[in-house]
């Protein structure tokens, strides 16, 4: 390998290492203090980096929050999908996955970063890349359920968007509530009822 190539590879590896460090530090700081109170000077100093590294990797503080939100929201989706996969059928899996995502709104880190600061700073959560990935998974499940005759022959994307939106908005409601613990079971029950409305009528 040429020296120039080795140097380029080393720079790329260093950038990736710095990115991982900054996301981990920001995740901890945002969870403990909230986005607005988080100091970028302190955050970068804690991991032995400069603000220049932050700007180079994320553009600004908002870009760093977007990366943290994407990481946590993706982890939430993966966890929900794992729970859904353990259910006895595609239908039960769809319900379990939605309920699991809603229940994660009780997690303090999820509440503060993804469901409170995220929408306030980054805008509509339904437009986040992580939510779009989750939507595609839900759409695939809906398509299978329609093909199996379990769900009504509706437009799969429309049904998936409404299901995903219901789970997301239930989580947002829980996070903003003064009593998340009491709101959560109500949200899950309503989600199940809404999803059941998509079931095909049995003759």
Where are these regions (language model features)?
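Hydrophobic/aromatic residues within well-ordered alpha-helical segments
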Residues: 18, 61, 68, 72, ...
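Hydrophobic alpha-helical connector segments
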Residues: 67, 81-110, 160-163
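Basic, helix-initiating cap at the start of DNA-binding domains
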Residues: 1-33, 37-49, 62-66
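Amphipathic alpha-helical packing segments from all-alpha helical-bundle domains
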Residues: 74-77, 122-150, 157-161, 185, ...
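Base-recognition residues in the alpha-helical recognition helix of bacterial helix-turn-helix
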Residues: 31, 55-59, 67, 71
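Key DNA-contact positions within bacterial/archaeal DNA-binding proteins
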Residues: 52
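Hydrophobic alpha-helical segments that form the core
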Residues: 100-103, 154-173, 185-195
């Amino acid at each position: 390998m040429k020296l120039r190539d080795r140097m380029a590879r080393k720079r790329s590896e260093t950038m990736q290492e710095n990115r991982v460090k900054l996301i981990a530090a920001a995740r901890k700081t945002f969870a403990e203090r909230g986005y607005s109170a988080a100091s970028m000077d302190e955050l970068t100093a804690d991991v032995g980096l400069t603000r220049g590294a932050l700007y180079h990797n994320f553009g600004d503080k908002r870009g760093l929050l977007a990366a943290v939100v994407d990481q946590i929201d993706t982890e939430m989706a993966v966890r929900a999908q794992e729970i859904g996969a353990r259910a006895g059928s595609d239908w039960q899996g769809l319900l379990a996955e939605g309920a699991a995502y809603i229940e994660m709104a009780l997690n303090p880190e999820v509440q503060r970063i993804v469901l409170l600061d995220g929408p306030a700073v980054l805008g509509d959560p339904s437009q986040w890349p992580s939510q779009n990935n989750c939507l595609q998974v839900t759409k695939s499940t809906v398509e299978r359920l329609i093909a199996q005759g379990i769900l009504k022959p509706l437009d799969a994307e429309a049904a998936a968007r409404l299901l995903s939106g219901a789970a997301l908005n239930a989580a947002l409601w829980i996070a903003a509530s003064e009593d998340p613990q009491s709101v959560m079971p109500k949200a899950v029950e309503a989600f199940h009822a809404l999803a059941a409305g998509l079931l095909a009528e049995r003759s």
